[in-house]
């Protein structure tokens, strides 16, 4: 791309983002009853006239202004710089915004970050990933193994922006069948000095209908991008990216708090959302939904997985078949629990496991923090050792036959490398991204590539489970 063409594209994207971002987004639907009475609610709102949306707090306006300023500066810079240098500059420049995010309420900062990504106020990675990071799994080629875990983009609002930042894959959700608000606020607590977060959000979700419409609209756009990119010559017969276009998209499914039939909730999620997913996740490990973790028991998990697999397989699929089905488990499990889960996974030929969700324990040094007693699941650096130990144990129990995604406490390329050597084929992060911002993504990928090359590995797949070989 020439510098003039790049500048024109940048200005157009900035203009479009400004137009789309002129109105601040309202809150999600309040409860499950609102979903069942959607038509009545819509009529009532029409009669009452448009809602008045309160302006964002002053800190939010300042932060938005700073982000727009960076975008304008980037537009000026790209006019005179080559694309690679511009990308590097833009990613590094986002670090200037991180201190401003720290001044905001945790949940408002998260909301603002999602809005920024959905409207294009984030850098877009144009540099190719190091070839050593590429791998193939489930018939899809990942350009790198670093993914964004579920919880950041709960309602699939910013998939394209997040994939564009350079993640190898993005997982949206957890998505529940009916809209629900989740637990009362405040429900997100920063333990900044420990690189950790405690949350008790409780599956706040706009529901599968809203998410399906959003993914459906994105699906068409991604399909066109895939068709366009397929005209370019390639040396590989495996598509780079997912069946719905460039980039791999996972959909994480949850259950409603008021639901008495968890299986029905997951089946409904599969029927509605699987057509847009490159892989599906059954989340049975959040500590913030009462009774959810009981589904990790051997009998309960076996019954659940069999019914969800059947629901997926009964749908009509093209040549590439149905999306892989994974289960996300907790780190707070006994040896017997892990053995039971491994047995179910092997017996039912589960496509993968995500290890792990947040912990209800308070690993050192987070246990000394004043907020440590807040209820909820802890994520971030203090979770790394616990989640990695569970990962290692599960790799042994499954004999390396089931792809594992390592999640929990990853904040550097070295951390990702340790997860891979411990048995992870892919790696996810979230909390470190919340603290470090977009600049973290290229740094982790570069560090991981250095680790692999340092130890003589020619690919990620060669290093998977290396500690046991």
From Swiss-Prot:
Residues 227-236 have a biased composition (Low complexity). The keyword ATP-binding does not apply. It catalyses: (S)-dihydroorotate + a quinone = orotate + a quinol. Binds 1 FMN per subunit. This is Dihydroorotate dehydrogenase (quinone), mitochondrial. Catalyzes the conversion of dihydroorotate to orotate with quinone as electron acceptor. Its cofactor is FMN. It is an enzyme of class 1 (oxidoreductase). GO terms for cellular component: mitochondrial inner membrane. The chain crosses the membrane at residues 62-82. Substrate binds at residues 154, 199-203, 283-288, 357-358. The gene is PYRD. Pathway: Pyrimidine metabolism; UMP biosynthesis via de novo pathway; orotate from (S)-dihydroorotate (quinone route): step 1/1. It is found in: Mitochondrion inner membrane. GO terms for molecular function: dihydroorotate dehydrogenase (quinone) activity; dihydroorotate dehydrogenase activity. Belongs to the dihydroorotate dehydrogenase family. Type 2 subfamily. PROSITE patterns: DHODEHASE_1, DHODEHASE_2. It is a single-pass membrane protein. It comes from Oryza sativa subsp. japonica. InterPro entries: Aldolase_TIM, DHO_dehydrogenase, Dihydroorotate_DH_2, Dihydroorotate_DH_cat, Dihydroorotate_DH_CS. The lineage of its organism: Eukaryota, Viridiplantae, Streptophyta, Embryophyta, Tracheophyta. Residues 219-247 are annotated as: Disordered. Keywords: Flavoprotein, FMN, Membrane, Mitochondrion, Mitochondrion inner membrane, Oxidoreductase, Transit peptide, Transmembrane, Transmembrane helix. GO terms for biological process: 'de novo' pyrimidine nucleobase biosynthetic process; 'de novo' UMP biosynthetic process; pyrimidine ribonucleotide biosynthetic process. FMN binds at residues 150-154, 174, 252, 283, 328, 356, 380, 409, 430-431. The active site is at 286 (nucleophile). Residues 1-37 form a transit peptide.
């Amino acid at each position: 791309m020439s510098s003039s063409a790049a500048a024109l594209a940048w200005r157009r994207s900035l203009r479009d983002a400004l137009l789309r971002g002129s109105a601040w987004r309202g809150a999600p639907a309040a409860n499950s009853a609102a979903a069942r009475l959607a038509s009545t609610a819509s009529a009532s709102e029409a009669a009452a006239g448009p809602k008045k949306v309160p302006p964002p707090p002053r800190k939010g306006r300042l932060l938005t202004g700073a982000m727009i300023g960076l975008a304008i500066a980037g537009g000026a810079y790209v006019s005179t710089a080559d694309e690679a240098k511009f990308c590097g500059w833009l990613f590094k420049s986002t670090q200037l915004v991180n201190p401003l995010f720290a001044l905001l309420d945790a949940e408002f900062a998260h909301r603002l970050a999602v809005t920024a990504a959905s409207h294009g106020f984030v850098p877009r990675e144009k540099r190719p990933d190091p070839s050593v990071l590429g791998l193939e799994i489930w018939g899809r080629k990942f350009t790198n193994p670093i993914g964004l875990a579920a919880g950041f983009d709960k309602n699939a609002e910013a998939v394209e922006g997040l994939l564009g930042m350079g993640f190898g894959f993005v997982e949206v959700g957890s998505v529940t069948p009916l809209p629900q608000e989740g637990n009362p606020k405040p429900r997100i607590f920063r333990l900044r000095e420990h690189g950790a977060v405690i949350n008790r959000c409780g599956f706040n979700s706009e529901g599968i209908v809203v998410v399906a419409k959003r993914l459906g609209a994105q699906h068409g756009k991604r399909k066109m991008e895939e068709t366009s990119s397929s005209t370019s010559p390639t040396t590989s017969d495996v598509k780079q990216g997912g069946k719905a276009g460039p980039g791999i998209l996972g959909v994480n499914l949850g259950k409603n708090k008021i639901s008495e039939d968890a299986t029905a909730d997951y089946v409904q999620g599969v029927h509605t959302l699987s057509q847009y997913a490159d892989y599906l996740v059954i989340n049975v490990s959040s500590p913030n939904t009462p009774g959810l973790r009981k589904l990790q028991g051997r009998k309960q998990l076996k019954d659940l997985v069999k019914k969800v697999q059947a629901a997926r397989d009964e749908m009509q699929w093209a040549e590439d078949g149905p999306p892989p089905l994974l289960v996300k488990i907790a780190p707070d499990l006994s040896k017997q629990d892990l053995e039971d889960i491994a047995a179910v996974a092997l017996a039912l030929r589960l496509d993968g496991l995500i290890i792990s969700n947040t912990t209800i324990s308070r690993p050192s040094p987070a246990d000394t923090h004043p907020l440590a007693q807040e209820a909820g699941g802890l994520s971030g650096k203090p979770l790394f050792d616990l989640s990695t130990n569970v990962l290692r144990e599960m790799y042994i129990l499954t004999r390396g036959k089931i792809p594992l995604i390592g999640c929990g406490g990853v904040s550097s390329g070295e951390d990702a490398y340790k997860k891979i050597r411990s048995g992870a084929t892919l790696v996810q992060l979230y909390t470190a991204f919340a603290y470090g911002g977009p600049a973290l993504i290229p740094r982790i990928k570069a560090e991981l590539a250095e680790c692999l090359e340092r130890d003589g590995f020619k690919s990620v797949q060669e290093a998977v489970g290396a500690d046991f070989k």
